[in-house]
Amino acid sequence: MLKVKNVTLRFGGLVANNDVSMEVRDGKITGLIGPNGAGKTTFFNCISGVYTPNEGKIIFEGKEIQGYRPYQINKAGISRTYQIINLFKKMKVYENVIVGMHSRLNSSVTDSLFKTKKEREEEKKAYEKALELLDFVGLLELKDEPAGSLPYGKQRLLEICRALASDPKILLLDEPAAGMNATEKNELDVLCKKIVERGVSILIIEHDMKLMMGLADYMYVLNYGKLLAEGAPFEIQNNPAVIEAYLGGE
């Protein structure tokens, strides 16, 4: 579904991603781990169009997308969340979800300005879809609350909900469990598996190794911008190089 081939990204003399190749398989949860500064979020930024790699290819559904802008990547079917929560905190919860639908809405400026029948029908459908997604992630009862009033873990779930609003085929999750307690992490685990059941593949960056080992079908490890290892979770967990670089060797 998504293939990244030999991607290199440089910032002057700094090589942030160095000849990185990986694949996100259809219907699977793919994990990406590595120590702080390994280049994981930078890699997400290459996939999502924030950065254009200096070398290599990013192929989504058979089409090269490196060089696409973020809105084009989103429209193509790749959505993401961020390390730092990026909600419109004064807007209602359901309104934040509707914002995530922007790449799928069809109303013109004229429709919006004059509130045409088409615009009213689209607003109704967007609202109904927002409620369905909020119910899916367990936030329906909070739909009318200001997003900023939600507990931190719930804000994380709202970000995922908003990312789902664009009907992605692949969802990039950047440390979604950060700041969550044990109960919330269990809920996140269940939610990710439900998302895959909806037909959305996931590429996830996460530092919680216990969560990742039970969640990912396949994993990649970055270290100093280079691919250190790949394999099934149990293989990664027992890989001496990974233990030394990330899990903490003796």
PLM feature spans:
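Glycine-rich phosphate-binding loops of nucleotide-dependent enzymes
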Residues: 1-250
